[in-house]
């Protein structure tokens, strides 16, 4: 498919008139084709069964497309754009898939990802197009942002920032969005850049799918260029790679989803003022990547989720429609290929140079009149300094700006002539230096690659003082100055090693350089001895090199210089040291404070100054972190003034510094002063420690007197309250440690107990695994188990099932002799069976899972009650018939001469006295309490008379008593009969309840014995089988019933626990 054809964005005077170039690309992997996610036809791209126009994308890379095809399609033009002075961004968006990772980072064999190819071609283009008047430096940074917790991680901080400063995304109304405290590491070779890239990529490739969705990696390659000549110009261009995830699957977790990320990208492409989720870290990262970009390429890829692929396709279509509207709104038609140029005031375009780079060819670059910067368009990343200058003369031609075409956009410049003399220009000498070798570097930074041994591209320049003291300028280097200086390498005029590039003054004789530091041999030896032997206080810093037992003094010294510098807040941490010097004439010292260029400086009239000097204009394009330079320089100036006042009082230091013939740069002076200050603090600490050791212990009551005497004598006062507080803190710490020790012991005991429990469980599991028969029996039994409390038929009902019984179900029948005999016999049988361990023949089946009841209730079924009632009625009827027959056969013939076939004669009974008698239906009832022997007709009384004849009933009602005697029975024995009946009912109820409870207890024991045997506890099963209830003998019926109910509850709980355990084991098996 043809490349994206839109006219190149012209670099005009106003950045608002510049339209960023936008390309849309997509990749189709072999997995997408195999699973039917994407299919490409002649006119459509089918994604998840839906057709999309092929014109939506500028490039569609099939499965057979190589990395070189992708490079030639869009990456080469982006590198050309960077060399032309623009920022460029590649935004790769898609789910975690092998195709996406291979396109961006390459595989483990070829390692030909897009980022690797961009680094290689960029470094090769810099090496092949060197210019003696141009310095180019490449810096690399890698940031990862997680939208889950809004955290920002600097992936290269272990190589650049031992203090691990917090990286922030700052949204400034004037400068835009920028990264603060990010680690920008200078890379000089391809191997170094690939090493840092691999370190950053490792964090991305090891992420799981969910973490990949919610995290985004931002890798940038920044080109800092400086052009030397009559005027100095510089700037920064940036090539960014933004590897974005696709967000959360849903918004329930509070994270940003794919539509939310798409709305942010659309707002950035449309250049809307309102951007959704403006304060989120993800939105700020996207703004940081796209706000200054003049050339943006979207690279979409697809994953395994259908909805994610549809969202990506919809986003691509929206961006394509937005691009068409923006191009048509500005009156430009997509045509031509990418080029870069400028337009003059007449409308004619004048090309200032392009670079064509191919993966296999050599870049061809035409020289440009002036360097342009993509950061210059945003007017946010260039800081202009006016530093210490030297008196020089310039030519009249240099007082005015040389005539340049309107297409060239120079940076801010200021030319001031305070002396009124026509200056004569003198060219600057730009010397470069090679990086020194530090043997102590490995102790501070632990992740140095093998290729960087002996090289310190990222260390702070604070150690230059020590290096220069160890190697004085006249003896540190014997090699001559290189005739053809190389960018960021070589030797300086002072013949010593240094970091980076130095913009030096005109050549100074070597003899004057010897007195640079104004230190005699004694002071130098003292400083060297202190730096070799001193140890930094632990409260100032905590360095990882001490944790790894760094024994070298060089390692300790370098860690002290980096991490515990007293003035580190006013010294900028950079890899190269920008050193400036001033030349003096006539032995007079010129004092020129550092300041930042402002509008007030531009408006000052050159004739208002009385000083005979001309300041040298140094313009340097700095990174965004240099925006703090205003505060830094203000602090530096204040401390320099304070130091000059102290030098006036101190004669030794003031004399040694006033006799110098050459000014020392402010940076070196304050480095030296910081070391002396640290040395003084160390000495004070040692003196105080010695005094504390030599001080004798005194009584507590004399502390105040001694303190006053010490104040009066002018000696050092010891703060005893602080010492007491320190002791209290130590005591509290010891108590806390003791409490922790007790907790540790408890935790150890708990661990031992836990191990024993696990060992027992393992033994049980092992036994169950060895005995397959037990497992099979448990499985067969569990087939009848039920988790519900009411499962099964009428014959299998749970104990906890609450049933509403009929009101007469628990009422006893009329107590007769036959009933008493039956009850006595049943009790005797049950006691005998309970003692022998045997039970009734019909026991309930073990076929249901029994839950723990809330309260115990006797299980009485309706069928059982009905059968027992019928059985009682049949028994009472049979007993009545038998007794009636016996009485009829054994009745006295004297008493009954004849009998009616329709009535039954009842024997009279005496009650209430000898003269009262009655007969009725209650007198013939067998087992009655009122039954008496029959009186014969021949029996006589004591006086020889016959007893009064008892009235006998021969009526058809069979035993109705006469009305004359009934009232006597009702009034005399009614209360006694009711009380006796209640006692009998209570006794019978207790007997029945005890019988049923004992029967239930026997069932529970049988079931518990079987459950114990099923889980392998044979001893417990034997104990349960041999247990008896002889211990309850001798107790009252009520106490015995309560005790048996409590035992039944315990047995139910044990049975439920055993069944649940067997079910758990069977489930695991």
From Swiss-Prot:
Post-translational modification: Phosphorylated by unc-51.
Gene Ontology terms, MF aspect: ATP binding; microtubule binding; microtubule motor activity
Residue spans of biased composition, Basic and acidic residues class: 883-897
Ranges annotated as biased composition (Polar residues): 938-960
The species this protein was found in: Caenorhabditis briggsae
Domain Kinesin motor: 15-325
PROSITE patterns found in the cross-reference section: KINESIN_MOTOR_2
Protein known as: Kinesin-like protein vab-8
Family the UniProt entry places it in: Belongs to the TRAFAC class myosin-kinesin ATPase superfamily. Kinesin family. KIF26 subfamily.
Top-level lineage group: Eukaryota
Sequence intervals crossing the membrane: none
Subunit-structure text: Interacts with unc-51 and unc-73.
Coiled coil residues, start to end: 719-769, 990-1027
Subcellular location: Cytoplasm, Cytoskeleton
Gene3D superfamilies per UniProt: Kinesin motor domain
Compositionally biased intervals (Low complexity): 339-364, 391-407, 824-847, 906-928
Keywords from the named record: ATP-binding, Coiled coil, Cytoplasm, Cytoskeleton, Developmental protein, Differentiation, Microtubule, Motor protein, Neurogenesis, Nucleotide-binding, Phosphoprotein
PANTHER family with a match to the protein in the record: KINESIN-LIKE PROTEIN CG14535 (PTHR21608:SF7)
Entry's Gene Ontology cellular component terms: microtubule; striated muscle thin filament
């Amino acid at each position: 498919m043809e490349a994206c054809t839109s006219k190149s964005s012209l670099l005009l005077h106003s950045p608002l008139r510049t339209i960023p170039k936008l390309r849309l690309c997509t990749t189709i992997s072999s997995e997408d084709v195999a699973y039917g996610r994407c299919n490409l036809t002649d006119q459509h791209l089918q994604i998840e069964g839906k057709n999309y126009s092929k014109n939506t994308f500028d490039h569609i890379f099939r499965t057979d497309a190589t990395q070189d095809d992708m490079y030639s399609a869009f990456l080469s033009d982006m590198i050309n754009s960077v060399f032309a002075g623009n920022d460029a961004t590649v935004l790769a968006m898609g789910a975690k898939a092998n195709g996406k990772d291979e396109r961006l980072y390459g595989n483990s064999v070829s390692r030909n990802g897009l980022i690797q190819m961009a680094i290689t071609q960029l470094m090769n283009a810099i090496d092949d197009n060197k210019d003696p008047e141009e310095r180019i430096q490449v810096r690399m940074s890698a940031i990862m942002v997680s939208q889950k917790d809004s955290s920002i991680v600097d992936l290269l901080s272990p190589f650049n920032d031992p203090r691990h400063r917090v990286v922030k995304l700052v949204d400034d109304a004037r400068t835009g969005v920028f990264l603060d405290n990010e680690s920008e590491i200078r890379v000089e070779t391809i191997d170094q850049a690939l090493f840092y890239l691999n370190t950053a990529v490792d964090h991305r490739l090891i992420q799981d799918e969910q973490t990949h969705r919610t995290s985004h990696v931002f890798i940038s390659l920044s080109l800092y260029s400086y052009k030397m000549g009559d005027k100095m110009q510089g700037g920064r261009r940036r090539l960014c790679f933004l590897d974005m995830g696709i967000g959360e699957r849903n918004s329930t977790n509070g994270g940003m989803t794919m539509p939310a990320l798409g709305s942010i990208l659309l707002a950035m492409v449309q250049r809307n003022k309102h951007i959704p989720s403006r304060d989120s870290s993800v939105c700020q990262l996207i703004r940081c990547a796209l706000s200054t970009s003049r050339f943006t390429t979207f690279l979409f890829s697809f994953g395994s989720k259908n909805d994610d692929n549809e969202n990506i396709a919809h986003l691509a279509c929206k961006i394509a429609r937005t691009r068409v509207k923006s191009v048509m709104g500005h009156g430009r038609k997509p045509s031509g290929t990418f080029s870069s140029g400028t337009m003059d005031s007449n409308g004619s375009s004048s090309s200032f140079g392009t670079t064509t780079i191919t993966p296999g060819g050599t870049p061809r670059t035409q020289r440009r009149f002036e360097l342009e910067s993509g950061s210059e368009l945003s007017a946010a990343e260039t800081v202009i300094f006016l530093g210490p200058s030297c008196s020089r003369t310039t030519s009249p031609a240099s007082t005015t700006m040389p005539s340049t075409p309107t297409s060239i956009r120079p940076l801010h410049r200021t030319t001031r002539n305070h002396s009124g003399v026509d200056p004569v220009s003198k060219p600057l000498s730009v010397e470069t230096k090679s990086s020194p070798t530090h043997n102590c570097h490995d102790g501070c930074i632990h992740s140095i690659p093998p290729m960087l041994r002996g090289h310190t591209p990222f260390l702070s320049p604070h150690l230059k003082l020590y290096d220069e003291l160890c190697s004085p300028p006249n003896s540190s280097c014997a090699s001559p100055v290189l005739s053809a200086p190389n960018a960021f390498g070589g030797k300086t005029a002072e013949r010593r090693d240094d970091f980076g590039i130095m913009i030096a003054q005109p050549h100074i004789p070597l003899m004057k350089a010897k007195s640079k530091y104004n230190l005699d041999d004694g002071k130098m030896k003292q400083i060297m001895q202190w730096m070799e032997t001193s140890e930094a206080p632990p409260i100032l810093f905590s360095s990882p090199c001490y944790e790894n037992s760094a024994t070298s003094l060089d390692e300790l010294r370098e860690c002290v210089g980096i991490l515990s510098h007293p003035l580190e807040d006013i010294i900028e941490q950079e890899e190269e040291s920008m050193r400036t010097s001033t030349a003096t004439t006539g032995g007079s010292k010129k004092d020129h404070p550092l300041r930042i260029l402002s509008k007030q400086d531009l408006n000052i009239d050159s004739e208002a100054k009385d000083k005979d000097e001309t300041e040298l204009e140094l313009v340097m394009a700095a990174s965004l972190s240099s925006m703090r330079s205003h505060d830094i320089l203000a602090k530096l100036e204040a401390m320099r003034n304070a130091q000059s006042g102290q030098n006036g009082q101190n004669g030794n230091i003031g004399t040694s510094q006033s006799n110098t013939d050459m000014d020392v740069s402010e940076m070196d002076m304050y480095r030296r002063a910081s070391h002396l200050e640290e040395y003084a603090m160390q000495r004070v600490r040692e003196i105080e420690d010695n005094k504390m050791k030599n001080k004798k212990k005194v009584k507590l009551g004399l502390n105040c007197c001694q303190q006053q005497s010490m104040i009066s004598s002018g000696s050092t006062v010891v703060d005893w309250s602080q010492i007491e507080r320190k002791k209290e803190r130590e005591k509290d710490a010891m108590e806390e440690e003791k409490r922790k020790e007790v907790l540790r012991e408890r935790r150890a005991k708990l661990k031992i107990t836990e191990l024993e429990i696990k060992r027992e469980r393992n033994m049980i599991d092992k036994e169950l695994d060895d005995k397959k028969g037990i497992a099979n029996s448990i499985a067969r039994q569990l087939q009848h188990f039920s988790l519900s409390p009411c499962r099964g038929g009428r014959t299998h009902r749970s104990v906890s099932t609450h049933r509403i019984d009929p009101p007469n179900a628990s009422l006893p029948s009329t107590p007769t002799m036959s009933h008493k005999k039956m009850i006595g016999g049943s009790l005797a049988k049950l006691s005998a069976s309970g003692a022998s361990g045997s039970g009734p023949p019909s026991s309930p089946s073990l076929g249901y899972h029994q839950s723990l009841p809330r309260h115990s209730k006797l299980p009485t079924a309706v069928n059982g009650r009905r059968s027992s009632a019928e059985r009682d009625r049949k028994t009472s009827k049979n007993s009545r018939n038998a007794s009636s027959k016996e009485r009829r056969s054994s009745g006295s013939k004297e008493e009954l001469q004849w009998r009616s076939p329709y009535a039954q004669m009842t024997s009279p009974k005496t009650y209430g006295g000898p003269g009262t008698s009655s007969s009725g239906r209650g007198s013939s009832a067998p087992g009655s309490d009122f039954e008496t022997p029959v009186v014969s007709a021949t029996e006589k009384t004591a006086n020889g008379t016959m007893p009064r004849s008892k009235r006998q009933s021969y009526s058809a009602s069979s035993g109705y008593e006469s009305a004359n005697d009934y009232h006597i029975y009702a009034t005399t024995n009614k209360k006694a009969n009711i009380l006796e009946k209640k006692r009998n009912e209570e006794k019978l109820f207790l007997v029945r309840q005890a019988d049923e409870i004992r029967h239930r207890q026997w069932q529970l024991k049988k079931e518990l014995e079987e459950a114990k045997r099923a889980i392998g506890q044979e001893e417990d099963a034997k104990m349960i089988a041999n247990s008896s209830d002889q211990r309850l003998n001798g107790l009252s019926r009520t106490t015995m019933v309560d005790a048996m109910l409590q035992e039944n509850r315990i047995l139910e709980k044990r049975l439920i626990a055993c069944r649940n355990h067997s079910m758990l084991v069977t489930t695991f098996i």
